[in-house]
Curated annotation (Swiss-Prot):
Entries under PANTHER family matching the protein: B2 BRADYKININ RECEPTOR/ANGIOTENSIN II RECEPTOR, MELATONIN RECEPTOR TYPE 1A
One of the GO biological process terms: G protein-coupled receptor signaling pathway
Gene: mtnr1aa
Transmembrane portions of the chain: 30-50, 64-84, 102-122, 145-165, 188-208, 241-261, 268-288
Name this protein carries in UniProt: Melatonin receptor type 1A-A
Membrane topology qualifier: Multi-pass membrane protein
Keyword Cell membrane: yes
Top-level division of the source organism's lineage: Eukaryota
Residues with glycosylation annotation: 4, 9
Keyword Disulfide bond in record: yes
Subcellular location, principal: membrane
InterPro entries: GPCR_Rhodpsn, GPCR_Rhodpsn_7TM, Mel_1A/1B_rcpt, Melatonin_rcpt
Family: Belongs to the G-protein coupled receptor 1 family.
Length: 350
């Protein structure tokens, strides 16, 4: 899901040779942008993980994928992004060949892990709404953990070959070690299709089916014995749909540039301005800090737990027991299979 870079190996690590002549304000802007992304990424995704850990309402099958997605976003903020930041301010890569390989590998793990987890979330939503009578069996705790492990196994499997074919290279235009794919058009097309276009198609299908069912249920006039989809359910699915849309918007420019270059490199490469290539990369980087913000804005239970965690940190009580009122409130609500849904939907597929 990354585009072509320039050559880097163990004997070609001179930062002065890699540096691009850019005005100081450009590197400063990119550096500040990345610092903001790193800080929000780490704090936001830690809030997501701790929220699910602390709040019984959030401990359900659907949120296993949410936590897995948060881990995928954390991976890049902890290691690759700080190395990119170092490269920006040193105007070149001076961290050695091995760090370049590890950084590129972890970036790939993060982005492919993200799209696979988003696909898993969409399938979970689809089963919960459109096949809810089978949902409990499909998404038992054991099965859900197995699905997440499968996602990460497929993610690593998709990335490992790059370590052996020498495709992890440093690109001075974006100060990053990434995947050099210009050498093989077929490989680039395959990567974009299987790691972006195909998952996007699957997720789109799942959400279209969900919204068709939601519209049908809300238009019913006569009372029947079939349970309704609650407003909480709709809000929760909107939350996950927004997460998907933001990912697609942030990553689409980079992937389509890569696809165009792979199809006709001689014609397309001269037509792509450097600023567009750089902007598409940093826009993709920015996506890793957005999900936690979306949960806080659109999901009431996440928002409340965020506040409790912040207050707990400020009062040094984060790992102490919760208040009796909070405990009683949580005992009244039975956790549901997705996000914060408190009412199980039992509507069969339409």
């Amino acid at each position: 899901m990354f585009m072509n870079g320039s050559s880097l190996n163990s004997s070609a690590l001179d930062p002065s040779e890699q540096a691009l002549q850019r005005p100081p304000w450009v590197t400063t802007t990119l550096g500040c942008f990345l610092i903001f992304t790193i800080v929000v990424d780490i704090l936001g995704n830690l809030l997501v993980i701790f929220s699910v850990y602390r709040n019984k309402k959030l401990q359900n099958a659907g949120n296993i994928f949410v936590v897995s997605l948060a881990v995928a976003d954390l991976v890049v903020a902890i290691y690759p992004y700080p190395l990119v930041l170092t490269s920006i301010f040193h105007r070149g890569w001076n961290l050695g060949y091995m760090h370049c390989q590890i950084s590129g590998f972890l970036m790939g793990v993060s982005v492919i892990g993200s799209i696979f987890n988003i696909t898993g979330i969409a399938i979970n939503c689809y089963c919960y709404i459109c096949h809810s009578l089978k949902y409990d069996k499909l998404y038992s705790d054991k099965n859900s953990v197995c699905y997440v492990l499968l996602i990460w196994a497929l993610t690593v499997l998709a990335i490992v070959p790059n370590l052996f074919v020498g495709s992890l290279q440093y690109d001075p235009r974006v100060y990053s070690c990434t995947f050099e794919q210009s050498a093989s058009s077929a490989y680039t097309i395959a990567v974009v299709f299987f790691h972006f276009i195909l998952p996007i198609m699957i997720v789109t299908y799942c959400y279209l089916r969900i919204w068709v069912l939601v519209i049908q249920v809300r238009r019913r006039v006569k009372n029947d014995n079939r349970p309704k989809i609650t407003p909480h359910d709709v809000r929760n699915f909107v939350t996950m749909f927004v997460v998907f849309v933001l990912f697609a918007v942030c990553w689409a420019p980079l992937n389509f540039i890569g696809l165009a270059v792979a199809i006709s490199p001689e014609r397309v490469v001269p037509l792509i301005p450097e600023w567009l290539f750089v902007a598409s990369y940093f826009m993709a980087y920015f996506n890793s800090c957005l999900n936690a913000i979306v949960y806080g804005v659109l999901n009431q239970n996440f928002r409340r737990e965020y506040k409790r965690i912040v207050v707990s940190v400020c009062t040094a009580r984060i790992f102490f027991g919760e208040s009796s009122n909070e405990a009683q409130e949580r005992l009244k609500s039975k956790p549901s299979p997705l996000m914060t849904n408190n009412n199980q939907v039992k509507v069969d597929s339409v």
